[in-house]
Swiss-Prot record:
Family: Belongs to the SPT6 family.
Biased composition (Pro residues): 1639-1653, 1675-1685
Gene expressing this chain: SPT6
Region (Disordered): 1-247, 1632-1723
Bias type Basic residues, positions: 80-90
Function summary: Histone H3-H4 chaperone that plays a role in maintenance of chromatin structure during RNA polymerase II transcription elongation thereby repressing transcription initiation from cryptic promoters. Mediates the reassembly of nucleosomes onto the promoters of at least a selected set of genes during repression; the nucleosome reassembly is essential for transcriptional repression. Essential for viability.
Location within or outside the cell: Nucleus; Chromosome
Domain SH2: start-end pairs: 1363-1445
Protein name: Transcription elongation factor SPT6
Length: 1723
């Protein structure tokens, strides 16, 4: 061979890449220095040096010419350096040589014979990726196994389960790569060489030799032996002695001469080794690793850890590897179940799959009970596929569906009927159960191995005295050998029986704990040996927890039993003999209980228990008396009974069937859990059966969460009657059947044993187990519910617009529209001041094409139009305006989207949608006119639909880093629009792209109760089901990172394998996959992964250009058909086209399929085939069920990869309202009372009724019609502006919700407010199991404790201030009584720790309380940094509050009291003064001031207009440095106050003369006796704020001139009728009648009566309509019915007459016969 032909080449070199020419030609395996090619000794630099003989000559000459002394020094230094380097590294290099033994082993494992032949090393034969043209008929008959034999050479490695080496194969029949894939060696998948990167094929055969030759050696000795072998081979390689001279064309004689002349090279070996080590160290120094650059967290995030690399290269689906992590998990996956184990697994799993399968197939009364055997067989077969063949659920559901259905033929209708044996969701459940059963088998094997170590087989081995330590039933040392043999066999039989019955990991743990109890130290020693690695085979799976699967991870890890030292100590004493005298053992008791017969009965000793126990007393073992001895013996027995696995299983079942749940709130829970708290639902639950928990899983999960928060105590227990019954059952099987005093005495001792076992062991164990069992059951139930919700979302396909459906109906258009063109529009929050409208357009392939921005899409208002006209006039028509609406229409006409998606997160989105719909209609009309579209079909094709889609994914996307990386040029709102458009085209794509943010999608509020990893697993399953159902176009995904996000959900793949797949296609196939076969032939995927994912990777044929002869497209690669089934569609197509084999000779096997799929009507041709008959023939001849497969092939040939998803629909109106506003049915519903702000008041007229426009906190617009604001409303009867004003806050009742317009109809009618929904804001309770009695007791108790706690806190609180005292109000008054006026006391408040009360002395027996709110508190006892007085201001400390707030009010009080018009604190003296002065001056008015004792901080301004007028009183409020009268609140002194009074009085008198109702006027209620104000003469009611209504008296939210504000009236609507519109409904409107008055009735809300000042009506004298009520001290009956006063509405008068006025007041209700139901004393 020429020199240029002997270029070193990799073992596996593709023909395309050069290197070795063809299979018949060998490769030079000897390098110029004698090294084998591929041995690892060469690199690129070495090859360059070897190719230059001159350079080699100079190096050799320089080497030989070295000085001897320098040579010795250098060599010594090199040797020292070499020794140091050997200590630092484990291995110099890997040996690639494969000898004859290796080839023999490979042939043996593959089952292929090989011919013994000395000669060159061989390699695997190669095949082609596609069958040759001259052998198409044979190719069509190939099975999938034969396809995979055609593995092409590749330099990376062979996709096999074991490591292998490829050799030239000219004349030896070695197994193909496909056969090696299925060789079945022990570490098939686990040790596969990386499928996507070069791995030097290290130690392929060497490790097998380790298994055989190094038996019995520990790990260090094995490693030393391996190192020695590597060193020997390396030296041989370096010296060339390992090379076969025949391979280099040198015969043995010439080779011997070379050795005689030059030696074997060992003399200069040190020099070569030193150079090699230098190069090794230099390479190691220069080599950069990930860990040298990135942090560990970054490496893990990028999936570059060693575990990630292992997952990539192992031939096991990634999701299975993640479900079973680590080496132990891999061993679990590798274990193949036998047919017997599969049958047992099927029986075990079939009862746990679902309630449906249990009810329909397993229940004898089930609908399909006759198909029970078919169901079990299907379960067994699916488990075989999952556990042995490692096939994932999507593959099984798609390609093994024939095994998942049972067919019955209806003879009457002559058609098949199908019964679903397993659904897709049930298959996922079965997958988890299969892994769990595998784990169970491994645990059993471990436990059996441990038992075999500690248990002595007395038949074959001698027994030592201390070896048979088997518990209390062990035979004593002096018994015969036969008895010992029998005891040993019985113990083994018991153990095996327990192990066979164990059906869960908990029961395996029970058996382990039982063995530990029985065998004590022996068991612990065996476990210690296992945990220390002495018996590695038994401990490989110790501690394995399958973390990813919900069913498997539900089971806790293998728990080690606790030590029972006291039991063991007593067991080694004579007390064990005493315990044995009680009768039967725990094993025998368990046998009696489970068999329901008394197989074993105890025999009573002949002495009484205490007398019999005397012989077992002794201080050595602590039994000083018979009582203590019996107690210790009973403790041992109860422990054995309590630890018996069978009895524990019985107790668990009892708890599962009969346990009850009781909840008791803690002290903290009583305070925290109110009626609005989510936990209020179960706050007082009692006796709820545990079996009902799955009906409401979220409730139980909330219970556990509340218990973790220390808010409740969760108790799960049995009823006394149930526990007593079970105790009797145990006792009856444990007690003796004897009668008499002696038997009774012993049976009482036995009863004590049973009770102790129950109390100490069985019941606590059952309680703990059931608690965790219910947790897992609840989680699984809730996960299934969320699974259904997610499936519903991801199963939606693209929107199908009216235009798309019209184009699909058009016969002129051949290509079917599947994906719409989308324009997404949003203005985000919808604030016109800052939010613009943004639009993003995507074409039908999902490509981002345009982004546009518009300031506003609303039509111009009349004012804006007028402004534009004026601007045009000013500029003489030269002004230019931007018409955003026209621009939007232009965009629609240009892009012609099929749909426009409108969404956002404000209520204004609904308005935007209406505007967009208008513009879309305009654009449609203009398109039709421009294109002259006349027919309905043509016009429909131009329709632009306006829709709304779910935006939860878009909201997540807009803030994500992924969005910023993909579209940095877009704003967040633009990215939001882009995500909306993508969602409209394919929801599953958007969900798949979320990645780790997937669980941020809230489908159910209770999903927060679930573990996030399990929730994500179920979400990914839902996405994976849809992704695999619709496939992934692999070549499109290669060019789109967005589409690549779906690859991890393909069966067999995952994030790591999908990433590796993309990289492999990019590097090996230049980024384009021509056909599916290349995935395996080019070593892109390994066998198992390919088997799972092949049919879900779609290859669109119109995107491909034919490559070379081998790599040609296959039309079937664009279908759901798996390559293993390609023969079926090929045969079907050929038959449908009437083609024969000779017609297809030399053609591609799928040519008939291509012709059929391109046919105009393939369905008609395929309908001629009898597929059912063909399926029957296949089953009869080959035993293959292929009916569903054949019908699936038929469907795919007609419509390849047809989208099976349902077309996407808009969210419901309720869902849209929640999207736009955040309101849900729990926050907004009819009958709810909500807080609204008045935005506009529209008065009524003859044309329309008046109304009030409001806005809710969520932005929803509301309307209050006048008739729902005022009872019996008529236009003109009352001014709505007199009732409410803009920016005022009201409480309104929701009458009706318009979900489409996002508006509500409201009412503020007191009558309707009274009928508010009682359940608003409250958490519904579990009424069936709610303990009312306990709730009432707890509430009373909690109220009392809260009161005491508040008092204690008040007493304990200390504030460092001279004015602070721990006083209550009474104590403060007592203290201030002797203090001067203006003294201040700061004290604790009854409102809580964040309030203070400031009490100051106004006058004798008059004290004002000021409520101070503390803000910014460090703790509950510290003083707040901000002290706020509501409506007055905030202060930084107490000194500032006293100086700037209290002292100025004291000054104003002193000013008033020193004024000449102040007449003291006695109201009678004030009235007497006014009356006397009026009598003296009958034609003049008079006024004076007095102190209001009922309302500290207020003065009374009382006046008489003339002698005959009644005394009226207006309130004067004292403010810091000011008085307040009506709207005037900055009156600096008494003079200013008097002037304000005169001004306001004159203004109201003028209004009264014009018969106009004063704005907000409110009358002073007439007293019951004496001095009554005429009903017409109303004291102005100041139900308005400052600056409103001129002279109105300041309103306080209740009827009357002035009163203390009613509770929570801060935002009440002022009104003249007693605060009927206050925040608390009708609290002041028409409450309880005055004492002695008739019951109140709903007021009829007419207009307010006119103000009639004294002296202004009826010519200035006494009012003509003044009622003749009796004066003070002169009681007398009123007239039968007084006349209706002038100007007063009759309904209003009737209301006053029947006592409907407000009763909330300060002062005493006179309520006498002469009153009208509630006047105020002295007013």
């Amino acid at each position: 061979m020429a020199d240029e032909e002997r270029v070193p080449a990799p073992y596996f070199q593709d023909d395309e890449e050069g290197g070795a020419s063809d299979e018949g030609e060998g490769v030079d395996l000897i390098k110029s220095h004698g090294n084998l090619v591929g041995s690892g000794g060469e690199d690129s630099s070495d090859e360059e040096e070897d190719d230059d003989p001159e350079e080699a000559r100079r190096v050799a000459e320089g080497f030989i010419a070295e000085d001897d002394e320098e040579e010795e020094e250098d060599s010594e230094a090199r040797r020292d350096r070499r020794r140091r380097r050997k200590k630092k590294r484990k291995q110099n290099e890997q040996d690639f040589e494969v000898d004859e033994d290796d080839l023999e082993l490979l042939a043996e494992n593959t089952g292929q014979p090989r011919r013994k032949e000395a000669g060159r090393l061989k390699r695997f034969r190669r095949g082609s990726a596609s069958p040759p043209a001259d052998d198409e008929a044979a190719a069509r008959q190939r099975t999938l196994d034969q396809i995979f034999e055609d593995d092409d050479e590749d330099e990376d490695d062979i996709r096999s389960g074991r490591r292998g080496v490829n050799y030239d194969d000219d004349d030896e029949d070695l197994p193909s790569v496909g056969q090696a894939l299925r060789a079945g060696v022990a570490r098939k998948q686990r040790e596969v060489v990386g499928a996507y990167e070069d791995d030097g094929l290290d130690d392929f055969i060497e490790e097998d030799e380790d298994d055989e030759e190094m038996q019995g050696l520990d790990e260090e000795e094995r490693e030393a032996r391996r190192q020695q072998r590597r060193e020997e081979k390396r030296k041989a390689r370096l010296s060339g002695s390992a090379a076969d001279p025949a391979k280099a064309g040198i015969d043995h004689e010439a080779w011997d001469e070379i050795h005689e002349i030059f030696g074997n090279g060992e003399d200069y070996f040190w020099a070569l080794e030193d150079e090699e080590e230098d190069a090794f160290d230099e390479e190691k120094k220069n080599k950069m690793e990930y860990k040298d650059i990135f942090e560990p967290a970054q490496i893990a995030e990028r999936m570059l850890t060693e575990d990630d690399e292992r997952i990539k290269r192992i031939d096991i689906p990634e999701r299975l590897q993640l479900a079973c992590p680590g080496e132990e998990g891999l061993k679990l996956l590798e274990r193949k179940l036998t047919d017997t184990e599969l049958f047992e697994a099927a029986k075990w799993a079939s009862t746990r799959i679902s309630q449906r399968t249990a009810a329909e197939f397993l229940d004898e009364a089930g609908l399909f009970h006759r198909q029970r055997s078919e169901f079990i067989n299907a379960v067994q077969l699916m488990l075989s596929y999952m556990l042995n063949d490692l096939l994932e659920v999507p593959f099984l559901f798609q390609h093994r569906f024939d095994e998942l259905e049972h067919l019955t033929f209806d003879e009457v209708e002559r058609q098949y009927r199908s019964i679903d044996l397993l659904t897709r969701r049930e298959l996922y459940t079965l997958s988890g159960l299969g892994l769990k059963f595998k784990t169970l088998l491994v645990r059993k094997d471990q436990l059996r191995a441990t038992f075999n170590k500690i248990h002595v087989d007395v038949k074959t081995e001698p027994i030592q005295d201390d070896e048979l330590d088997g518990g209390l039933d062990a035979m004593p040392a002096d018994e015969s050998r036969a008895a010992r043999v029998e005891s040993s066999q019985r113990q083994r039989a018991i153990f095996e029986d327990m192990l066979a019955q164990a059906a869960s990991l908990e029961e395996i743990s029970d058996i382990t704990e039982y063995l530990t109890l029985r065998y004590g130290q022996q068991m612990r020693d065996a476990q210690a040996l296992t945990s220390n690695g002495t018996d590695q085979a038994a401990s490989d799976l110790q501690g394995l927890t399958l973390t990813s699967d919900p069913l498997v991870s539900a089971t806790p890890a293998f728990k080690k039993p606790s030590l029972v030292g006291q039991y063991e100590r007593n067991k080694k004493t004579v007390l064990a003999e005493l315990a044995k005298k009680f009768g039967i053992t725990s094993d025998e008791l368990a046998s009696n209980v489970t068999s329901h017969t008394r197989q074993y009965s105890p025999r009573d000793p002949e002495e009484s228990p205490f007398k019999f126990a005397e012989q077992f007393t002794g201080s050595a073992w602590g039994a000083h008396s018979p009582e203590i001895a019996l107690a210790k013996a009973k403790m041992m027995l109860s422990q054995e009974i309590g630890k018996d696995p069978i009895l524990k299983r019985e107790m668990r079942q009892l708890f599962k069937d009969a346990a009850e749940i009781n909840i008791e709130p803690t002290e903290r829970g009583m305070t925290v859990i109110d009626d609005q708290h989510p936990y209020a639902n179960f706050k007082f639950i009692a006796n709820k059966p545990a079996r009902l928990v799955p009906q409401n899983p979220s409730q139980y999960l909330q219970m556990l969460q509340a218990e973790d928060e220390l808010l409740i105590k969760l108790d799960i227990d049995l009823k006394d009657v149930v526990l007593t019954r079970f105790e009797a059952r145990l006792y009856n099987n444990y007690a003796s059947e004897g009668v008499g005093e002696l038997s009774n005495a012993w049976n009482e001792q036995r009863r004590d044993v049973i009770r102790e076992a129950l109390k100490t062991h069985l019941v606590p164990n059952g309680r703990i187990w059931l608690k965790e069992f219910l947790r897992e059951e609840s989680r699984e139930t809730l996960l299934r519910h969320v699974d259904v919700l997610m499936t519903k979302r991801v199963q939606e396909g693209p929107f199908m617009s009216k235009s798309m459906m019209a184009r699909n109906r058009d016969p002129k258009i051949e290509e079917e529209d599947r994906i719409p063109r989308v324009l997404a529009v949003s203005h985000g929050g919808g604030d016109p001041r800052k939010d613009v409208v943004q639009a993003v357009y995507l074409d039908e392939r999902g490509r981002f094409r345009e982004h546009a921005t518009f300031d506003d899409l609303r039509p111009l208002s009349a004012r804006q139009m007028q402004e534009r006209e004026l601007e045009l006039e000013r500029t003489r028509g030269k002004a230019e305006f931007v018409d955003h609406r026209a621009d939007f229409v232009k965009l629609l006409k240009q892009r012609r989207p099929d749909i426009v998606v409108v969404s956002g997160w404000s209520v204004r989105t609904a308005e935007l949608k209406r505007h967009v719909q208008e513009l879309a209609d305009t654009a449609h009309q203009e398109i039709c006119d421009a294109d002259r579209l006349h027919s309905d079909l043509e016009r429909d094709q131009a329709v632009i639909d306006v829709v709304t889609c779910h935006d939860d994914v878009a909201r997540i996307y807009q803030h994500s880093s992924r969005a910023a990386e993909e579209f940095p040029e877009l704003s967040e709102l633009g990215r939001y629009c882009l995500a909306l458009a993508r969602y409209a085209q394919s929801p599953v794509n958007e969900f798949a792209a979320l990645g780790s943010d997937l669980t941020a999608v809230i489908l159910d509020p209770n999903q927060r109760l679930l573990p996030q990893d399990r929730l994500r697993l179920h979400f990914e399953r839902c996405i994976g089901a849809v992704v695999n159902e619709n496939g992934v176009e692999i070549n499109q995904a290669m060019t789109s990172t967005y589409l690549q996000t779906m690859l991890p959900f393909v069966a067999g793949l995952g994030p790591r394998k999908a990433h590796a797949l993309v990289n492999a296609i990019s590097t090996k196939l230049e980024g384009t996959l021509i056909n599916r076969t290349l995935l395996i032939s080019r070593n892109i995927l390994t066998f198992q992964v390919f088997q799972n994912c092949a049919s879900f990777l779609r290859i669109e044929q119109d995107m491909l250009l034919e490559a070379d002869e081998d790599d040609v497209p296959d039309v079937l690669d664009s279908t759901r058909i798996h390559p293993e089934d390609y023969d079926f569609p090929r045969k079907m197509a050929a038959d449908a086209l009437n083609k024969h084999e000779e017609d297809l000779e030399g053609e591609h096997p799928s040519l008939p399929c291509k012709e059929l799929m391109e046919d105009a009507d393939p369905a008609d041709k395929l309908n001629t085939l009898d597929l059912d008959n063909y399926a029957t023939m296949l089953f009869e001849r080959k035993g293959e069920r292929k009916r569903a497969t054949l019908h699936s092939c038929r469907t795919e040939l007609i419509k390849p990869y047809d989208d099976l998803r349902e077309k996407q629909s808009e969210p419901s109106l309720e869902e849209m309202l929640t999207m736009f506003t955040g309101e849900t049915s729990k926050t907004l519903a009819e009958g709810f009372v909500v807080s609204v702000e008045v935005t506009r008041v529209q008065e009524g007229n003859r044309m329309q009724e008046g109304h009030i426009k409001c806005r809710l906190d969520s932005g929803i617009e509301g309307t209050i019609e006048a008739e729902h604001a005022v009872e019996h409303y008529t236009p003109g009867s009352v001014r709505l502006r007199d009732l409410v004003r803009p920016q005022q806050t009201l409480d309104a009742l929701v009458r009706k919700i318009d979900y489409k317009m996002c508006t509500v109809q409201l009412s503020i009618s007191p009558w309707e407010l009274q009928h508010r929904a009682t359940h608003q804001g409250k958490t519904p309770i579990d009424i069936k199991f709610y303990d009312r009695r306990k709730a009432d007791q707890w509430n009373e108790h909690a109220a009392a404790k809260a009161k005491l706690r508040i008092q204690a806190r008040r007493q304990n609180r200390v504030i460092d201030h001279p004015n602070y005292h721990n006083f209550n109000y009474k104590a403060a008054v007592t203290f201030l009584r002797s203090q001067p006026r203006g003294t201040v006391v700061v004290r604790p408040s009854s409102k809580g720790d964040d309030h203070l009360a400031v009490t100051w002395k106004v006058d004798d027996d008059v004290y004002q309380n000021i409520d101070v709110t503390e803000l910014d508190k460090e703790s509950e006892y510290s003083l707040g940094r901000v002290l706020r007085i509501e409506g007055m201001g905030s202060y930084s400390d107490l000194d500032e509050l006293i100086v700037n707030h209290v002292k100025p009010m004291v000054h104003m009080v002193e000013m008033m009291m020193n004024h000449e018009k102040y007449k003291g604190a006695d109201e009678e003296d004030l009235h007497r003064f006014l009356t006397n002065w009026s009598l003296a001056n009958p034609s003049r008015s008079v006024y004076a001031f007095g102190l209001n004792k009922d309302r500290p901080g207020y003065f009374n301004l009382s006046f008489k207009a003339n002698r005959d007028a009644a005394i009226q009183t207006w309130p004067v409020k004292v403010l810091p440095n000011a008085f307040k009268l009506g709207p005037a609140d900055q009156l600096a002194d008494v003079a200013a106050l008097c002037n304000a009074f005169k001004t306001q009085y004159t203004t109201q008198a003028s209004m009264a003369r014009g018969a106009k109702t004063p704005y907000g006027g409110g009358r002073t209620p007439a007293p019951g006796m004496g001095g009554a104000t005429p009903l017409g003469g109303r004291t102005p009611y100041g139900g308005v704020r400052n600056g409103m209504a001129g002279s109105a008296t300041p309103g306080q939210g209740v009827a009357g001139g002035y009163t203390t504000p009613m509770i929570n009236v801060a935002s009440a609507t002022p009104n003249p009728y007693g605060g009927a519109y206050g925040r608390n409904g009708a609290a002041g409107g028409y409450g309880a009648p005055a004492a002695g008055g008739p019951p109140g009735r709903p007021p009829s809300m007419p207009g307010a009566p006119p103000m009639m000042p004294p002296g202004m009506a009826s010519g200035g004298g006494a009012p003509s309509y003044a009622p003749p009520f009796a004066g003070a001290g002169e009681p007398g009956p009123p007239p039968a019915r007084p006349p209706v006063p002038h100007g007063m509405h009759p309904d209003r008068f009737a209301q006053a007459e029947y006592g409907g006025a407000s009763q909330q007041s300060y002062g005493e209700n006179s309520g006498g016969a002469g009153g009208y139901g509630g006047g105020y004393r002295g007013y």
